[in-house]
């Protein structure tokens, strides 16, 4: 029997880490889907980035991508854990499944998915509230960096400037970057934490030509200097 869990929360609250740990502790098949969420007045959602799936797939190679139609065979459906992630700024008004935004329910119909559990950071006690922030105003910039390669010195300088206000008041930044030696680095920063998180992923790109894998940056904050960042 499949388990379909829907999880939401504000940017940077810890959704992806919770999902990773949940998958690691599960012995059966695992499937993942990320939805884009919805912007509100003065609160702009980031585009539906591929960063989270690329990171999770690197850590769990057999993870199924549910954004691809017919990606689950009948055999895969046996005892599968499906987690659907989407960003949401506000705490749902109702508990459990009754609190799911109807727009999400309608969107899931095209994937033939119906959640039987719903958790939201800031509402449900089993989820950490350490980095669950109450955003009142937020802008978003997302850049596709596929085939871009960064030398480490330039990348470190850019990231330092970014999180220290050179391009506006950044509240949240997340990126997957390619290095010349084939390494794949996840950068993660949120204003509520001290310092950035860096993780070298398992995947190494061949050194012949530019890498085709996902490389993106998502920046959220206030008074962002779009032109300087681009």
Where are these regions (language model features)?
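Nucleotide-state-sensitive switch-loop elements of NTP-binding domains
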Residues: 2-92
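P-loop NTP-binding site
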Residues: 2-18, 31-33, 126-230
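Phenylalanine-focused residue identity feature
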Residues: 23, 53-55, 86-90, 121, ...
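Structural alpha-beta junctions
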Residues: 27-31, 50-58, 95-119, 165-169
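Glutamate identity and glutamate-enriched acidic tracts
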Residues: 40, 44, 74, 78, ...
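Serine/threonine-rich low-complexity intrinsically disordered regions
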Residues: 42, 52, 73, 98-101, ...
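Long, charge-dense, solvent-exposed interaction surfaces that engage phosphate-rich ligands
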Residues: 76-77, 86-136
């Amino acid at each position: 029997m499949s388990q379909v869990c829907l999880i939401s929360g504000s940017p940077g609250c810890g959704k992806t880490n919770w999902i990773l740990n949940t998958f690691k502790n599960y012995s059966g098949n695992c499937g993942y889907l990320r939805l884009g969420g919805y912007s509100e007045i003065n609160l702009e959602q980031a585009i539906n980035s591929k960063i989270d799936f690329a990171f999770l797939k690197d850590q769990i190679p057999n993870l199924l991508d549910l954004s691809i139609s017919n990606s689950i065979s009948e055999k895969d459906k046996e005892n599968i854990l499906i987690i659907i992630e989407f960003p949401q700024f506000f705490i749902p008004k109702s508990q459990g499944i009754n609190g799911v935004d109807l727009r999400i329910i309608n969107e899931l119909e095209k994937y033939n998915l119906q959640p039987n559990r719903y958790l939201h950071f800031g509402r449900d006690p089993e989820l950490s509230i350490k980095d669950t922030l109450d955003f009142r105003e937020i802008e978003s910039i997302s850049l596709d960096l596929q085939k871009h390669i960064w030398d480490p010195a330039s990348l470190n300088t850019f990231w330092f400037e970014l999180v220290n206000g050179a391009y506006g008041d950044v509240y949240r930044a997340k990126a997957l970057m390619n290095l010349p030696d084939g390494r794949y680095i996840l950068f993660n920063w949120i204003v509520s934490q001290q310092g950035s998180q860096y993780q070298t992923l398992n995947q190494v790109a061949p050194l012949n030509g530019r890498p085709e894998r996902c490389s993106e940056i998502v920046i959220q904050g206030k008074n962002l200097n779009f032109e300087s960042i681009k």
